[in-house]
Amino acid sequence: MANLKLLLVGIGNPGPKYAYNRHNIGFVILDSLLNSSSASYQTNSKYSLARTDEEGVTIFYLKPLEFMNLSGKAVAEIAKKNGISPENILVIHDEIDFEFGKLKLKEGGGHAGHNGLRNIVEKLGTNTFFRLRFGVGKPSTASEVSDYVLSNFFPEEKEKIPELVQVSLQKIYDWVRERKNEFQKPSDI
């Protein structure tokens, strides 16, 4: 029987300057997820990639290392190279349309102006992948969006990040379990 292959993608911007920005919450969550496993990243100039294999499930953990708006190149490359279909991809990203701390797992949909998602949709040629949307709040005017997502969390928000990361991890574990159950379901012939 074939293994189920899943791709978990945390998107953000590379480098210490951006490490704790709102835009990098995808990296923070993916790193926490990987820390709870025995795997570690292998890094090249384009991405950091880790892999776990257990109970018939291969999970790839991907952090694209080009800027956010070029995230799709690494996602498409890893998906294609490993035969991973879009419905087995989960992208973890910041969401300005949600108040801080709101989390939502969603399949498909538009990019809502998020340049990282826009590029992933473009490079995969579809929007049918899953997303874990992490609410980071919204600035008062649209012209402030870029500065806002590239700013660090407020101290009172930073305090809540560890708990919200744990909730995010549970949502990811649940998604992996659902994908596994779907994969193992006998097909109707």
Swiss-Prot record:
It catalyses: an N-acyl-L-alpha-aminoacyl-tRNA + H2O = an N-acyl-L-amino acid + a tRNA + H(+). TRNA binds at Y18, F67, N69, N115. InterPro entries: Pept_tRNA_hydro, Pept_tRNA_hydro_CS, Pept_tRNA_hydro_sf. Keywords: Cytoplasm, Hydrolase, RNA-binding, tRNA-binding. GO terms for molecular function: peptidyl-tRNA hydrolase activity; tRNA binding. It is found in: Cytoplasm. It comes from the Bacteria. Its EC number is 3.1.1.29. The record marks N13 as: Discriminates between blocked and unblocked aminoacyl-tRNA. The record marks D94 as: Stabilizes the basic form of H active site to accept a proton. The active site is at H23. Belongs to the PTH family. This is Peptidyl-tRNA hydrolase. The gene is pth.
